[in-house]
Amino acid sequence: MAATTLSIATTIRSSSFSSGLASAHHFPSRPLSIEFPFSFGVSSSSTLSHRAIYLHPISAVKTPKKIKKIGSEISSLTLEESRILVDYVQDKFGVSILFSAPAAAALPPPLDNGGATASVERQTTFDVVINDVPRGNRIAVITAIRAMTSLSLSESKELIEGFPKKFKEGVTKDEAEEDKTQLEEAGAKVSIV
């Protein structure tokens, strides 16, 4: 931090010294000021201050035209072109997209020369759908739903009104079977899609 002048004001009162010393020396009645000669390129009339930089929230920053153009071009790509783009970016910049593995599993396999898929894929993720809940079993089903999820009471009630409703999406076969068993034991009619 640059400082142009450092002033130290001292008031020396004769009462703080012994009477013999005070009478031997003359002390000024106004404070002393000590000035240092360094200025670091700042004028002597300036004062020190803190500077703050205001940063706009990300949502308030204007998107450049170049970025908008790239975004619109990417959004118009087909699935096959998107896969090729991802491979290109991975090779070009040496990155891997591990965090989007579930999304990559949803992409269709590459096509053979004949246009047919290379192999038939098995379904790896399933949805648990509640088809119906009889009136006499509503409380038991709501209790089962709350035990299996972190839903509130009102959210659980909404889930058993108006059928069919998806209870869970994108779960493994074992988890889907377990959820189906628990809901059926509570009295709900459930299917796995």
From Swiss-Prot:
GO term, biological process aspect, one: translation
Compartments, as annotated in UniProt: Plastid, Chloroplast
Keywords: Chloroplast, Plastid, Ribonucleoprotein, Ribosomal protein, Transit peptide
Pfam families: Ribosomal_L12, Ribosomal_L12_N
GO molecular function: structural constituent of ribosome
Predominant location: plastid
Transit peptide, UniProt annotation: 1-59
Comp. bias intervals (Basic and acidic residues): 170-187
InterPro entries named in the record: Ribosomal_bL12, Ribosomal_bL12_C, Ribosomal_bL12_C/ClpS-like, Ribosomal_bL12_oligo, Ribosomal_bL12_oligo_N_sf
Region (Disordered): 170-193
Gene3D superfamilies xrefs: 3.30.1390.10, Single helix bin
UniProt keyword Chloroplast present: yes
A single cellular component GO annotation: chloroplast
Record family assignment: Belongs to the bacterial ribosomal protein bL12 family.
HAMAP family for this protein: Ribosomal_bL12 (MF_00368)
PANTHER family from the UniProt entry: 39S RIBOSOMAL PROTEIN L12, LARGE RIBOSOMAL SUBUNIT PROTEIN BL12CY
NCBIfam families in the record: L12
Protein name: Large ribosomal subunit protein bL12cy
Species assigned in the record: Arabidopsis thaliana
Source taxonomy: Eukaryota, Viridiplantae, Streptophyta, Embryophyta, Tracheophyta
